[in-house]
């Protein structure tokens, strides 16, 4: 079959287009038969992947970063669910700044190395998270699938602030957004229900993880495993700005000492979660804002669902 490569020319801080030739050269050197298209706007990757599946291309290869992977993955899943068939295999090529999904799956993060994995044709399935949320009216619903994590509260709040700081780039932009977000000290009262318990009370953040690493350096769900058939939900209430600033560096630790060890932070294993928040909260999935304001959110696990081209011992 012919592979469809969906390349995001804006990936890696607008350097994706410069790497098109390297991608094509690597794939040709490995004897891959492929057709390459480029995204032209946000969410275009989802439409291109959906049409590629409908037109019989396989595998579907996303060349970009985590936002690109998420768009393409959602197009694959939508096509599979519409036709009630197995999802088409997904291949990953690293053109982004962080490429968290590839790091989480222990895949090579150079173009030639990743191309060799795709050409080898070995498949392993991972779990996917599903998030369903409603707008404030409760009438309009949005469903999204994620491979890394999704969150409400402080995490997407910082993402929104970062998007509005258009005059800065790189890590200093995220640092400033974080400081502004913490200074505002946002808090939410939530009702959180899951298979095995519930919680009603204040929170600073809620994150639901399928993989441990997100945002390049943050382990928001440090014990999440994309092969275990469950999601990791982490919630916590940290009331003061000083305490938040003390806890935040611990989100960058992958092992002992991570923020989930803080007494105000709780980590649970779930197959589903339902959340109601007051006031409304922003919501992101794999780093992309889905709602700037929502109050009702549901999470579900799709175990052993998405086939990804990787070595059999990639875990």
Description of each model-found segment:
Residues 1-63, 70, 74, 315:
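ATP/NTP phosphate-donor binding region
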Residues 17-19, 73-76, 103-105, 219-220:
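Short amphipathic alpha-helical segments
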Residues 194-195, 225-226, 235-315:
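ATP/nucleoside-binding phosphotransfer catalytic cores, i.e., glycine-rich phosphate-binding loops
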Residues 155-158, 200-202, 213-217, 241-245:
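Short acidic/glycine-rich loop or secondary-structure boundary segments that cap or lie
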Residues 186-188, 202-204, 227-232, 271-273:
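A generic structural signal for short beta-strands and their flanking turns/coil linkers
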Residues 151, 155, 207-221, 289:
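Glycine-rich phosphate/pyrophosphate-binding beta-alpha loops
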Residues 30, 77-204:
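Catalytic core of DAGKc-family lipid kinases
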Residues 220-228:
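Active-site loop ensemble at the mouth of alpha/beta enzyme cores that anchors a bound cofactor
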